[in-house]
Amino acid sequence: MKIKRIEVLINNGSVPGIPMILNEIQDAIKTVSWPEGNNSFVINPVRKGNGVKPIKNSCMRHLHQKGWALEHPVRIKAEMRPGPLDAVKMIGGKAFALEWETGNISSSHRAINKMVMGMLERVIIGGVLILPSRDMYNYLTDRVGNFRELEPYFSVWRQFNLKDAYLAIVEIEHDSVDAQVSLIPKGTDGRAIR
């Protein structure tokens, strides 16, 4: 799988270990392949034909091997009970969060806002959201969150004046298309079966 771009929204102060963390994330993304066992990510170009959840599996396995905790709960506010973060690396008692979007665009907003809330509360020191490109989006489950659709809101998150915080969006894309490869299985929740 290839990384099209990394859009840094917040990079204030000193967040320890950022180069190492970003290298681990980029290396993990590059392990993502389809079909499984392939050395690249080849997608069947059926419009809305491919599932999204299986795509992140090898990335998460790689991060886990590097000491990241998977499906990690982070307590942000007493009145909030956000779902767990896909992956967390603890640095100096604080979490660096990673979310790989498998839901709709509303889920993308929630993922970013959860990380920003955690930074405001000082329990999260940084976060990265991984989103498909618009080209890749065309071949995935209907209405999955994607980079282009979230991009108009980047200026909102850039306005947060957070001390010692880092926030970025990584845009990913398939390496190639091939109508002969199998479709990525879809889940049975939300819009996955559409």
From Swiss-Prot:
Its cofactor is Mg(2+). One of its GO terms (molecular function) is DNA binding. The active site is at E101. Pfam families: BamHI (PF02923). It catalyses: Endonucleolytic cleavage of DNA to give specific double-stranded fragments with terminal 5'-phosphates. Keywords: Endonuclease, Hydrolase, Magnesium, Metal-binding, Nuclease, Restriction system. GO terms for biological process: DNA restriction-modification system. It comes from the Bacteria. Its EC number is 3.1.21.4. This is Type II restriction enzyme OkrAI. It comes from Oceanobacter kriegii.
